[in-house]
Amino acid sequence: MKACHVATERGIVLDGVLFQSGQQTDTIVIAITGIHGNFYSNPFYYNIGYTLNRSGIDFLYAQTNDAFDRMQTDNVVTGRKEWIGSWNERFAYTDEDIGAYIGYAEKAGYSHIILAGHSLGANKVIYYLAHNHDPRIAHFLLLSPADLDYMMSGVSGQEKRLIRRQVEQGYGNEMLPFPFMGWVSCIAYTAWDWLFSGLLNNVFTETDADFTQCSNITHTGALLIGTYDTFTDGDPTGFLQNINDHMPTACTEQAGLHRRDRT
């Protein structure tokens, strides 16, 4: 297990952790984290890494901009220190954040890359695959993607109006006067992305929702969710089945829908 540091196109350095099997392997699983899904808050990633290692597969725990609420990192373009986190993430960073980790794996010599994502990280993987038919990626793995419509249902109308007004008046980079969703301290632009951008709002409980991103994916892969998942409006299995139904590769032998009764 070793730390890895990956620079994005905008210069921000993201920190990940590489679990190496100790065997000669060309296969790696890159796991894109969800919000606050850092190496310290999710110890189950140790189990994933060590389990894959025992099968001769390397594992890269890939923290993105929102892995922590706030942390300091380097910007290799400006040469300065910067503060990043869930407090100022922009969803438009998704392509270059994921692309940086894929580039890291390719440069390290891996030719069989499985791109995984957990929670909001799964939504990011969907976004990336919908816009980048990247031949370096062999398959995808989506772990409990987040239903943003359900998550946003707890944001009051008054809070939505305040966020919209703050952005429209030119104060998007200012902190909100309240915790977004009740637990995220962030700037108005970040809350705007969650609520109004639609960039990562790509999975739904409704069968007739806009599944354009899912339908644009040409890779094959697998989906996994726990039946205790609380971000799916009460029906985790149906939620995952609905996503699978909108995947154009779902009928191929490589794709699959997997259910476990506990999480």
Residue ranges, per PLM feature:
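Catalytic histidine neighborhood in serine/cysteine hydrolases
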Residues: 244-263
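N-terminal cap/lid segment of alpha/beta-hydrolase-fold proteins
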Residues: 1-23
